[in-house]
C-alpha cells in the first residue's frame, strides 16, 4: 500500500513538471506516433506507446471508431512510465475498447482563431457545433500558452461604463481588468452577465468571446438567441462575438479545457489584431470543479474541502493569461458560483486574489426583491479612487455606502424597540436609506420578457446626480416605492406622478361609493 501511495505521488509530480515543459516546447517528432489503449477507467484512459510516450499535454486521436458517432480526442496529463501515458478524454469514452489504435497529433489541442470564428459556436476542440457548416479558418492555435511577460503587459485605469447603477456608482469596473460576480445558486449571476453583454458588447468597438464552462445547455441556447436578437451575432452580416461551450453534461476533461480554448481565441484578437477584447466566463467555479474531478480521477491526494492540491496553480495559469498588453487588452467578466453561499470556500477565495473588482450577490438582497441582488457593502473595486474616477463620483459613492452602513446598524434597534424610538435625525437616515436601497434596483433589458418591465440603461452622470440629490434630501417628498425597479431619476418622478394619479382616482371612486351609499 505504501509503495503504491509513493508511486502515485511521484506520478503527480511528473505530470506537473511535464505540463510546464510542454506548454513552451515546440512540436516534436512524435507526430503520427501510434499507440494502443491499455486501460479505460471512465474519463481516464491509459495509452501505451512502444516507441515512447509523447510529452504531457499532447493531444491524441483515437483512430478506431468502434461504432462511435463522433471522434475521440485524449490529452496526456501524466507519464506512468517511459511508454505509458495517462490521458483525460475530451468526449465520452462509451464504446471505447482495449487495444484501440491511438495516434499522436504532435502538439496540443488547437482551436481556430481569427474573424472567421465570429458568430459561431465551438466546443472545446474548436469544432463548430452550430450546424452552419465549416468555419473556413486560416489559422489554428494551441490552447496551452504562457502568460505575457511583465515587460509586455500594460496597466490601464479607465472606467468601463455598464449602464447598471449599483455597479457604475459603487464598484466601477476597469477596462482591461478582471471582474468577478460572486453568488450562490439562483441569485442572478448569469442574468447580470447577459445584461453586461447586452450593454457593453453592443456598444463595444472590439470583439467579445463567451466561454460557457460547465453551465446549463438551456442557458447557452438562450444566450445565443439573445445575441441574435440584439445583432451581436448577425447570421447575414458581421458578428462581434464568439461562443465556446463546454457544458455540464460533458466530461470533466472538456470542462477543464474549454476556458483555455475561449481564451486562446481572445488572445489572437488582442495580440495579432490589437483589439480590446471582452471575455465573459460563466462559470469560473466550474473550471475549478472540473480540474478537481480530473485530479481525483488521476488519484491525487485531495487538499482542503476535497479540492485538488494544485488549485492555486490551475487557476493562476488561466488568470495570468487574461491581461492587457502593449498591443491590446482583454477585459474579463467572470461569474463565480459560491458553494452553499460560503464565500470562504477555497475555490471562490482563491479567485478573489486575481480580480480588480468583486461584485457580491447576496441571497438576502434577492429575497427582499431587489434585483440585481448586489450587496454594496461587500463589494470592492481597485479603481474606486478619486485619482481615477471623478471626485464627485467618489464622494457620492462613499456617502451612499456610509448611509447604508448606518442603516444596517439602526435595523437592530428598530427590530427591538421600533422606529418610533429613533431620533429625528436617525428617522431621516432610515427614510433616505430605504429609498437608496430601492433605487439600487433596476429592470434589465434581457429580462423584459420575464418581468414585463422595460429595461433601462442609465448613464453614469445621471446615476451620480440622482444619488447625490437623494442624499441631499431633494427627493424626500417622493414616495419610497417610486424608487423601486426604475432607471434614472426622471423615471422615479414619472412613476411618482403616476402613483399620485392612481391614488387620486381611487380616492375619487371611494368618495363616489360613500356618497352613493349615504343617498
From Swiss-Prot:
Keyword list, A-Z: ATP synthesis, ATP-binding, CF(1), Hydrogen ion transport, Ion transport, Membrane, Mitochondrion, Mitochondrion inner membrane, Nucleotide-binding, Transit peptide, Translocase, Transport
Subcellular location: Mitochondrion; Mitochondrion inner membrane
Chain segment of the transit peptide: 1-21
Main location: mitochondrion
Hydrolase as UniProt keyword: no
Entries under PANTHER family matching the protein: ATP SYNTHASE, ATP SYNTHASE SUBUNIT BETA, MITOCHONDRIAL
Quaternary structure and partners: F-type ATPases have 2 components, F(1) - the catalytic core - and F(o) - the membrane proton channel. F(1) has five subunits: alpha(3), beta(3), gamma(1), delta(1), epsilon(1), plus the additional subunit P18 (Tb427.05.1710) that is not present in F(1)F(o) ATP synthase from metazoa. Subunit P18 (Tb927.5.1710) interacts with the alpha subunit with a 1:1 stoichiometry; the interaction is direct. Subunit gamma is part of the central stalk. F(o) has three main subunits: a, b and c.
Official protein name in the record: ATP synthase subunit beta, mitochondrial
Organism encoding this protein: Trypanosoma brucei brucei
Upper lineage: Eukaryota, Discoba, Euglenozoa, Kinetoplastea, Metakinetoplastina
Amino acid at each position: 500500500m505504501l509503495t503504491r501511495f509513493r508511486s502515485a505521488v511521484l506520478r503527480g509530480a511528473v505530470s506537473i513538471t511535464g505540463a510546464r515543459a510542454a506548454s513552451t516546447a515546440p512540436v516534436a517528432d512524435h507526430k503520427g506516433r501510434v499507440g494502443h489503449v491499455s486501460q479505460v477507467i471512465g474519463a481516464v484512459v491509459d495509452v501505451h506507446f512502444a516507441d515512447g510516450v509523447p510529452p504531457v499535454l499532447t493531444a491524441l486521436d483515437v483512430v478506431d471508431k468502434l461504432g462511435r458517432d463522433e471522434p475521440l480526442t485524449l490529452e496526456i496529463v501524466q507519464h506512468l512510465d517511459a511508454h505509458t501515458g495517462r490521458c483525460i478524454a475530451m468526449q465520452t469514452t462509451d464504446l471505447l475498447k482495449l487495444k484501440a489504435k491511438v495516434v499522436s497529433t504532435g502538439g496540443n489541442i488547437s482551436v481556430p482563431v481569427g474573424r472567421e470564428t465570429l458568430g459561431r459556436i465551438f466546443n472545446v476542440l474548436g469544432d463548430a457545433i452550430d450546424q452552419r457548416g465549416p468555419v473556413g479558418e486560416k489559422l489554428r492555435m494551441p490552447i496551452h500558452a504562457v502568460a505575457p511577460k511583465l515587460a509586455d503587459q500594460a496597466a490601464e485605469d479607465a472606467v468601463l461604463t455598464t449602464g447598471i447603477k449599483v455597479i457604475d456608482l459603487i464598484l466601477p469596473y476597469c477596462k482591461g481588468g478582471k471582474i468577478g460576480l460572486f453568488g450562490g445558486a439562483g441569485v442572478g449571476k448569469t442574468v447580470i452577465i447577459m445584461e453586461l453583454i447586452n450593454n457593453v458588447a453592443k456598444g463595444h468597438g472590439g470583439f467579445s468571446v463567451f466561454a460557457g464552462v460547465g453551465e446549463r445547455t438551456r442557458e447557452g441556447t438562450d444566450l445565443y438567441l439573445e445575441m441574435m436578437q440584439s445583432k451581436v451575432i448577425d447570421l447575414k452580416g458581421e458578428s462581434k462575438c464568439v461562443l465556446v461551450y463546454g457544458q455540464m453534461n460533458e466530461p470533466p476533461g472538456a470542462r477543464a479545457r474549454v476556458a483555455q480554448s475561449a481564451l486562446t481565441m481572445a488572445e489572437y484578437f488582442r495580440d495579432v489584431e490589437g483589439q480590446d477584447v471582452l471575455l465573459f466566463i460563466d462559470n469560473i467555479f466550474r473550471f475549478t470543479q472540473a480540474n478537481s474531478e480530473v485530479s481525483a480521477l488521476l488519484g491525487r491526494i485531495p487538499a482542503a474541502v476535497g479540492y485538488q492540491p494544485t488549485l492555486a496553480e490551475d487557476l493562476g495559469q488561466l488568470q495570468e493569461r487574461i491581461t492587457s498588453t502593449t498591443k491590446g487588452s482583454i477585459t474579463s467578466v467572470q461569474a463565480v458560483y459560491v458553494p452553499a453561499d460560503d464565500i470562504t470556500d477555497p475555490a471562490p477565495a482563491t479567485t478573489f486574489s486575481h480580480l480588480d473588482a468583486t461584485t457580491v450577490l447576496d441571497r438576502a438582497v434577492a429575497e427582499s426583491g431587489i434585483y440585481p441582488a448586489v450587496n454594496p457593502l461587500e463589494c470592492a473595486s481597485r479603481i474606486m479612487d478619486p485619482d481615477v474616477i471623478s471626485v464627485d463620483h467618489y464622494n457620492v459613492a462613499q456617502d451612499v455606502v456610509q448611509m447604508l452602513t448606518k442603516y444596517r446598524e439602526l435595523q437592530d434597534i428598530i427590530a427591538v424597540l421600533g422606529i418610533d424610538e429613533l431620533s429625528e435625525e436617525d428617522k431621516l437616515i432610515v427614510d433616505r436609506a430605504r429609498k437608496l436601497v430601492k433605487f439600487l434596483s433596476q429592470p434589465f433589458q434581457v429580462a423584459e420578457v420575464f418581468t414585463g418591465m422595460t429595461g433601462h440603461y442609465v448613464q453614469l452622470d445621471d446615476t451620480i446626480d440622482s444619488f447625490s440629490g437623494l442624499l441631499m434630501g431633494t427627493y424626500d417628498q417622493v414616495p419610497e416605492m417610486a424608487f423601486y425597479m426604475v432607471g434614472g431619476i426622471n423615471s422615479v418622478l414619472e412613476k411618482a406622478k403616476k402613483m399620485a394619479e392612481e391614488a387620486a382616482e381611487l380616492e375619487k371612486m371611494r368618495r363616489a361609493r360613500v356618497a352613493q351609499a349615504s343617498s
